[in-house]
Structure formats: structure tokens, C-alpha cells
Curated annotation (Swiss-Prot):
InterPro entries: DRC1/2_N (IPR039505), DRC1/DRC2 (IPR039750), DRC1_C (IPR029440)
Subcellular location: Cytoplasm, Cytoskeleton, Cilium axoneme; Cytoplasm, Cytoskeleton, Flagellum axoneme
Pfam families cross-referenced by the UniProt entry: NYD-SP28, NYD-SP28_assoc
Region (Disordered) residue spans: 1-25, 49-72, 451-476
Family, similarity comment: Belongs to the DRC1 family.
Oligomer and partners: Component of the nexin-dynein regulatory complex (N-DRC).
Top-level lineage group: Eukaryota
Origin species: Xenopus laevis (African clawed frog)
Coiled coil: 92-419
Alphabetical GO biological process terms: axonemal dynein complex assembly; cilium-dependent cell motility; regulation of cilium movement
Name listed for the protein in its UniProt record: Dynein regulatory complex protein 1
């Protein structure tokens, strides 16, 4: 075995081992082996004795041993700290897994409940429809009234079941909202605990690192003193060799100095000639610059005289300004007296206006009470009118359906019996309708859906317009998505007082967009903004609130060339604009009732509905009916003439029968035998073929 291999084995035994279970120790052992191999090659190349290296490597360095011990202790401390911190994450993951399992079970139960309710509702509806079909043939008003009441009670029961299901789902939704807030709070507490443990681990690590660093520094200091003692001897030997080499280099330097002096003499001669040439050139340049200096002095004298004149003019103007300032001070004194008088008048007018305001407030309250009473009466009359309208509609609709059914039966008889054609029933989808037609309200997105779409658009240069269609006779509005996003961000930043402090603390760890959406939800709830149209109203109002003062400024004076005619609202004006919006545009909102639907219904659909009933039988069938009517009239005339002919034929047959009877009696009479030439013989001779 070579000396290098023995040294490698000894260093492996003394330091980190390649067979260690710790990966860091194996890496460190490989590094030490590579360093030892390189050092051995270097010493072998320099001719040093490897026995000295063997003596040095027999014992491991104290610094390496202390460093390895410190590394192991610190690694164990870091692993323990990481395990302590990850315990929180593991507990959170387990809790989230449990919550998801419970959520799946609740979702399954809710789906089963909805399916059962849908089946029961469908069975009730089929029972109501079947009962209506069976009782439709009854024409007694009293029985019809009882049947209608029964059907109405069953429909009310069905609607009540639906409302109960909706109420249960809303309660479940509120419970989920509360659970969501609690989960957010729990997550915030877990994060605080996690941060606290991490800070504690950081403090412990810093403290331990400092202690280990002090120990390592002490060991290195001890090794340093030992190395200084060993290197000092080597240094003295090297200094002696250095003195000898310096003496040799000094002798060679003296020789080079003599050579350099000769070269310097030659360079001085060359530089002297170049200096004379440059001196002549520079003297010429100096003369040219002196001429330019004289010209500059003349220009300076002229400018000085101009400045003296301007100074005298400014001094005269300063005296005039002093006189004007004294006059303005006297004018300010007079205006101060006028201001005091105006303040007294203002105080009187404020008092008077307060009294008038109180009187107007009393009148306003009285008018509001009258308005509420009038509104109550209007709702009552609207309900009565709606009920009457519905009753008349149902009566006319029933009569219309009966007439249409009779016409269809007549058309079927004509097609099948008279024309012998296959009868195809027309489209009678309007016959399925019962009751007045309700106008279809336009579907609108919610305010939060619009806010989510706008906030999720990250393109800063997006100039696409968010257009809104015509609603209640208004023209469609176009507002850029960038403007809507900027206005909503201003609302989030400036309307923080509308958000609860508890919710604000919970939103702090979220991202900016998610935090803005939750803030907008609270702000929209406070302002009563529920649908897309309300959001555009708010944005347009804020834009107008910004433009109106600018338009007043344009009327009072001219704008600067670089100023913008239309800018977005400033953040300082947001609160005043929101207050004005609430006072001017916000109205109490209620649920959309059936009366409101009846008021907003489109009467054009009524015309189309009744026109569809009138056109249940197409125009082509009417032309067929007209042609059939004229043909039947002609057929009736033919049948009439045939009836007359049949009557005449019956009469002739009766006469013929009587004549045959008389003839038979005459032929069978006994008197014919007694005659020599009976009439029958003559008849047979005249008619032999008979």
C-alpha cells in the first residue's frame, strides 16, 4: 500500500467517513480526500518529504473537528425547528381534508333533498294538471268556483314548499358565510402561531450560531498561534535567502542605470527640438486669443451700459409699485369694514334660513307621510286592478279557447269527411298559456360579477368599451373598462370607513385583487348597488362630478393648451361624490312583486297573443272553406233538383203500377173469352216480340 493511500485511510478515520449515514458527512469526506490528493501531488512536485506530511496528518485539525461538531449540532437544531413549524401545516391540511369531506357529504344530502323536492313538486303539479283536465268539463259556476279554490290552495301549498326549501338553502348559505369567516380567523391565528414559532426558531438559531462561531474562532485562534510559531522560523530562513538575492539584483541594477542614463541624454536632445516647435505654435495662438479678448471687452462695455439703463427703469417701476401697495393697503382697510358688515348680515340670514329650513323640514315630513299614504292607496288600487284584469283575462281566454277548439273541430270534420284529406293540427302553443302574459325582464349581471370581470382585466391599455343595452327607454352607455376599474379602485381606497375593522384585518394577508373584490362587496351593500346598471350609474355620476367643475372653469376663463378637458375624479373628491350620489340617485329597493311585473308587462305581446288565437286556422284553410262552401251550394242545388225529379219519378211509378193493375184485370177478365177476337190477340199480333 502506498503512502498516499495510508494517509487517505487515516484521514478518513480521523475525519468524516464515506460510510456515514449522513449525506453531508459523505460529501465532506470526499472533499477532504480530494484536497489531500492535490496537496500530496503538489508536495511531490516540489520535492518535499512525504514523511513530514504523514506526521502532520496523523492528528486531525482541531478546527475541522470543531467545525464538524458545530455543523452536526446546528443541523439537528434546524431539523427540529423545521419539524416544529411544519406541524402547524400538517394540522391545517388535516383540518382542511376533514372540512372537504364534510362539505362533500353536505353537498350530497343537499342534492338528494333537491331531487326529492323536485320529484314531489312534479307529482303535485301533475296531480293539479290532471285534476284540472278532469274538472274542465263541468260547467256549473258553483262547482267551477270550488274547483278553482281547491286548485289555488294546492298551488299555494306548492309555492310554500318551494319557499321553505329556498329559506333552508339561504340559512345554509348564511351558515357557510359564518363558517368562512371563522376559517379565515383560524387561518390568521395559525399564521400568527407559525410566525411566532419561526421567530423563536430564528432567535435560537442566531444564538446557537453565535456560540458555535465563538467556539470555532477560539479553535482557529489557537491554530493560528501554532502556525505563526512554525511559520516564523520558515520566514527567517527565507529572509536570509532574500538578502543574498537582493545583493545580486543591486549589482545588476547599477549596470542598468548606466544604460538608462545614456538613453535619457538622447531623449533630452529630441525633446528640446520638439519643445521649440511647440513654443512657436503656442505663441501664435496667444496672439489670436488676445485679439478675441479685445473684442469681448468691447462687447462687455456695451452690455454694461444696457444694464445700467435697465436698472434705472426697474428702479422707477419699484417706486410706482410702492405707491400702488400703499393704495391697496388703504383699500384693504375699507374692504375689511365691508367684510365685517357682511358677516353680520350673514349671521342674520343664517338664523333666518335655519328657521325657514326647520319649517320646510316639518312640511317635508308631512308631505312624506302623505306620499306614503298615497303610495299605499296606489298599491291597493293596483292590486285590485291587477286582480280584475286577471279575472277578465281568464274569462276571455277561456271563451277564446272554446271558440278555437270548435273551429278546429269543424276544420277537422271538413278536412277528413268532406275533402277526404289527412288533417294536421296547427301550432297551438298559445293554448298552454293560462293567465296574463308577464313581460320578460332583461337579465342583468350582478354588481359583483361586473366588478370581478373588470378587476381581473390586467391589461393597462385596454380601451374596449363596456356597453350596456337600452333599459327603461334609456340609451346605451359606453364606459371604458379602464375607467371603471380606476373608479372602483378609488372607492376601495377612499371608502374604507364603510368596511368593518374586523374584516379589514382578515383581508390583510390576501392579494390586492381579492382584497378589492371583498371591499367592493361591502361598499356596494352599503350604497345599495346590486346590479350592473347601478354600477354604471355610479361610475357615470363620478365622471360627471369631475367634468362639471371643469366645464364651469371653461366658461369662466380659457384653459391652458396642455390641460385635459376630461379627467378622472381626484381621490379627495370621492367621498363628496359618493354622498351626492346617495342623495340624488339612491332609491329604496324592494323585491320584484307580481304587481310590478304586471305594470312592466309589454302590451304588444297581448296583441300578438290574441292575434295568434285569431290565426289558429291559417288563411289557406279559409280559402278552402270558401271554395267548399260555393261547391256545396251548387251541390245543394243539384240535390234539390234531384229531389224534385225523384218525387216525379215516384208519382209516375205509382201511376204505372195502377195502370198495370188495371191492365192485368182487363186481361184476366171473362169477357175476353166470349169475344171472337179478343183484344189480347190483337195486342200479341201488334207486339209479337213481347
Amino acid at each position: 500500500m502506498s503512502l498516499y493511500e495510508r494517509e487517505s485511510e487515516e484521514s478518513a478515520v480521523a475525519g468524516p467517513s464515506l460510510d456515514s449515514e449522513d449525506q453531508q458527512q459523505r460529501i465532506e469526506a470526499r472533499r477532504l480526500r480530494i484536497v489531500t490528493r492535490i496537496e500530496a501531488k503538489r508536495r511531490e512536485a516540489l520535492g518535499e518529504d512525504l514523511k513530514i506530511l504523514k506526521k502532520k496528518t496523523e492528528e486531525p485539525r482541531k478546527s475541522h473537528k470543531q467545525t464538524e461538531d458545530s455543523r452536526q449540532r446546528l443541523g439537528k437544531l434546524v431539523n427540529d425547528g423545521s419539524q416544529l413549524v411544519t406541524n402547524i401545516q400538517i394540522a391545517t391540511d388535516a383540518r382542511e381534508t376533514q372540512r372537504r369531506g364534510e362539505e362533500e357529504e353536505l353537498k350530497r344530502l343537499r342534492r338528494e333533498k333537491l331531487d326529492n323536492e323536485a320529484k314531489s313538486s312534479l307529482e303535485k303539479f301533475e296531480e293539479i294538471t290532471k285534476r284540472w283536465t278532469l274538472d274542465k268539463a263541468k260547467q256549473v259556476p258553483q262547482k267551477m268556483w270550488e274547483i278553482l279554490n281547491t286548485q289555488q290552495q294546492q298551488c299555494a301549498q306548492l309555492i310554500e314548499d318551494k319557499n321553505n326549501l329556498i329559506s333552508d338553502l339561504q340559512k345554509e348559505l348564511r351558515r357557510k358565510d359564518d363558517q368562512y369567516v371563522k376559517d379565515l380567523k383560524k387561518q390568521a391565528e395559525d399564521i400568527d402561531l407559525l410566525v411566532e414559532r419561526m421567530e423563536e426558531q430564528i432567535k435560537n438559531l442566531i444564538k446557537t450560531y453565535r456560540q458555535e462561531l465563538l467556539q470555532i474562532e477560539k479553535v482557529f485562534e489557537l491554530e493560528r498561534r501554532e502556525l505563526l510559531t512554525a511559520n516564523r522560523n520558515t520566514w527567517e530562513q527565507g529572509m536570509q535567502g532574500r538578502r543574498d538575492k537582493e545583493l545580486e539584483s543591486l549589482m545588476s541594477r547599477m549596470k542598468k542605470v548606466e544604460e538608462y542614463e545614456n538613453q535619457l541624454k538622447q531623449l533630452r536632445v529630441q525633446d528640446g527640438e520638439e519643445y521649440n516647435m511647440i513654443k512657436i505654435k503656442l505663441e501664435t495662438d496667444v496672439q489670436i486669443l488676445q485679439q478675441q479678448l479685445q473684442q469681448m471687452k468691447a462687447t462687455y462695455q456695451l452690455n454694461q451700459e444696457k444694464l445700467e439703463y435697465n436698472y434705472q427703469v426697474l428702479k422707477k417701476r419699484d417706486e410706482e409699485n410702492t405707491i400702488t401697495k400703499s393704495q391697496q393697503k388703504r383699500k384693504i382697510t375699507r374692504l375689511q369694514d365691508v367684510l365685517n358688515n357682511l358677516r353680520l348680515k350673514q349671521a342674520k340670514q343664517v338664523k333666518q334660513y335655519k328657521e325657514e329650513n326647520q319649517s320646510l323640514m316639518d312640511d317635508y315630513k308631512r308631505i312624506v307621510e302623505q306620499y306614503k299614504e298615497l303610495q299605499k292607496k296606489m298599491r291597493h288600487f293596483s292590486a285590485v286592478d291587477a286582480k280584475m284584469f286577471q279575472d277578465i283575462w281568464l274569462m276571455n281566454e277561456e271563451e277564446m279557447k272554446q271558440l278555437v277548439q270548435k273551429a278546429l273541430e269543424a276544420d277537422q270534420v271538413i278536412q277528413e269527411q268532406q275533402l277526404g284529406m289527412c288533417w294536421e293540427p296547427p301550432d297551438l302553443c298559445f293554448m298552454d298559456n293560462v293567465g296574463p302574459l308577464l313581460g320578460k325582464l332583461k337579465d342583468q349581471k350582478s354588481a359583483m360579477s361586473l366588478a370581478q370581470e373588470v378587476m381581473s382585466s390586467h391589461a393597462p391599455g385596454d380601451q374596449s368599451s363596456a356597453s350596456e343595452g337600452e333599459t327603461d327607454g334609456r340609451q346605451c352607455r359606453e364606459v371604458s373598462a379602464e375607467t371603471v376599474k380606476h373608479i372602483l379602485e378609488l372607492l376601495c381606497d377612499e371608502s374604507g370607513f364603510l368596511i368593518e375593522n374586523k374584516l379589514t384585518r382578515l383581508l390583510s394577508p390576501l392579494e390586492r385583487d381579492e382584497r378589492s373584490l371583498i371591499k367592493l362587496d361591502s361598499i356596494f351593500g352599503a350604497l345599495g348597488v346590486t346590479v350592473e346598471e347601478d354600477v354604471y350609474k355610479l361610475v357615470e355620476f363620478l365622471c360627471r362630478y369631475k367634468r362639471e367643475p371643469e366645464e364651469e372653469g371653461d366658461a369662466g376663463g380659457s384653459l391652458e393648451p396642455g390641460s385635459k378637458a376630461h379627467g378622472l375624479i381626484h381621490s379627495n373628491d370621492v367621498l363628496r361624490a359618493v354622498k351626492a350620489f346617495v342623495m340624488d340617485f339612491q332609491k329604496p329597493r324592494g323585491k320584484v312583486s307580481r304587481l310590478r311585473l304586471m305594470e312592466e308587462r309589454d302590451s304588444r305581446e297581448d296583441t300578438e297573443y290574441w292575434a295568434a288565437a285569431a290565426k289558429a286556422i291559417p288563411e289557406s284553410r279559409f280559402r278552402v272553406w270558401d271554395a267548399l262552401e260555393s261547391a256545396l251550394e251548387k251541390y245543394y242545388d243539384v240535390l234539390g233538383s234531384r229531389g224534385q225529379l225523384i218525387t216525379e219519378t215516384v208519382s209516375l211509378r205509382q201511376q204505372n203500377t195502377e195502370l198495370r193493375t188495371l191492365l192485368h184485370q182487363y186481361l184476366n177478365s171473362k169477357i175476353n173469352v166470349e169475344l171472337e177476337i179478343p183484344p189480347t190477340q190483337m195486342m200479341q199480333g201488334e207486339y209479337p216480340h213481347t
